[in-house]
Amino acid sequence: MSRKCEFLVVGGGIAGVSCAESLAIYRPNASILLLTESSIVKSVTNLVPVARYLHKFDVREQDVSEMGASFQTLVDRLDHINSREHCIRTKAGLEIKYRYLCLCTGGTPKLFSGKVVNPLVIGIRDTDSVQLLQRKLATAKDVLILGNGGIASELAYELKDVNVHWVVKDSHISATFVDPGAAEFFHIAMNECNAKDSSPVVAIKRMRYSEVLPKEQTNNHGAALGPDWHRSVDLSGAREGEENRLPKIYYKSRISSVQDLADDAGAIVKLEHEDGSFQQLTCDFIVSATGVWPNTDYTCDSPLQFSDDGGISVDEMMRTNLVDVFAAGDVCTANWPAAMHWFQMRLWTQARQMGSMAGRSMAAASEGESVYQDFCFELFGHVTKLFGYPVVLLGRFNGQDLGRDYEILVRCTRNKEYIKFVLQNGRLRGAMLIGNTDLAETCENLILNGIDLEPYGDDILNPDIDIEDYFD
């Protein structure tokens, strides 16, 4: 069996769907095929500007049959790429000829157990793995979470009726996104909210997912979770009456060994702390949330060029080293000279941006035209929520790659806001806005325009001075 298309996009996550949608806009009459491993795909909806170049959005889960007529879909799995002949083979044996190919195959969870399959260790990444988590939680009383990123941070405080042991390698929580000061802000807020049995006021809300179950019950690699994924699922354990129990956090620690107990009674976990001491815990299962590896579980007739982190190397047009083969999202690594205020993080925001850019680039190539890289790659920006608070991250928000030649200004109002400016040579290089995100557009302008802020000194964050009046 074989079929033919002009544009073939592999992957049903945000990057893949964004690429296909972008192609449908620029080449509405072209044949576009989206190849996805799961019948459930993810698309961006309710796109709302937070600043001129920064947007917040919802992630919608839907069945491929609901995608509309702008492009075709096929539920199957990529097995082999024949770049010379411009065709691919799927796991089901179908041959698909293409003119342009975009790989948006996402990432697979990094499990501390490595390639060894352990039923007591699960990685949270897609809808299927969340269902597995729910099933295990139903009979669990003690759960260990390993990791310090967004998913680990959400899980640690969202799990109910269960003892949570949270193991982090850093000296503060949520180190992927925030600094120790912001981590302390969150820690205090969560403790006090727990004591009052209330939730923090949320200024930005997203629609919750409606639960959509895939038709196929296989081990297929589904699309990554988006924001607020945990809001629509029951994350309750078997310790009834202990709903508001706070997680016990083990800082600067790692798992040394895991010993399975008999009769599926869980595991004994040995932790090693930074000072060399050891501690033993017992848990029903382990959630490994330590990031993702680029998913390149397919073969190719010509070797793809990979970066050091395992991602497919792409240039500013999202092109790989193979002719007419592009890549976008978690599976790729940006291999172009980065702009002054931008760097790559494997987030749904950049998945959307890269997917859209790949689609625009492919459409231009098909018509013999050239395009410029999208301006979103001039400034890092991400909108999310952590512990119920809206969060906006801009530029080098944690001083990334600035060495030690920068200063930080912070304004913090307990349980309300945490605002941080990163300045270098009097210029704003990055900003972190938690709770109060009204300054997002002003910060964006200050970073991009390189305005000298030295004359304003510390007053730049004085709550009695409206800096928006100065820098609109």
From Swiss-Prot:
EC number per UniProt: 1.8.1.-
Disruption phenotype annotation: RNAi-mediated knockdown results in failure to emerge from the pupal case and in lethality.
Keywords: FAD, Flavoprotein, Oxidoreductase
Cofactor names: FAD
Stored Pfam families: Pyr_redox_2 (PF07992), Rubredoxin_C (PF18267)
GO cellular component: a single term: cytoplasm
Gene3D superfamilies attached to this UniProt entry: 3.30.390.30, FAD/NAD(P)-binding domain
Domain of life of the organism encoding this protein: Eukaryota
Entry similarity comment: Belongs to the class-I pyridine nucleotide-disulfide oxidoreductase family. PYROXD1 subfamily.
Function field: Probable oxidoreductase.
Name under which the protein is recorded: Pyridine nucleotide-disulfide oxidoreductase domain-containing protein 1
Lineage, uppermost ranks: Eukaryota, Metazoa, Ecdysozoa, Arthropoda, Hexapoda
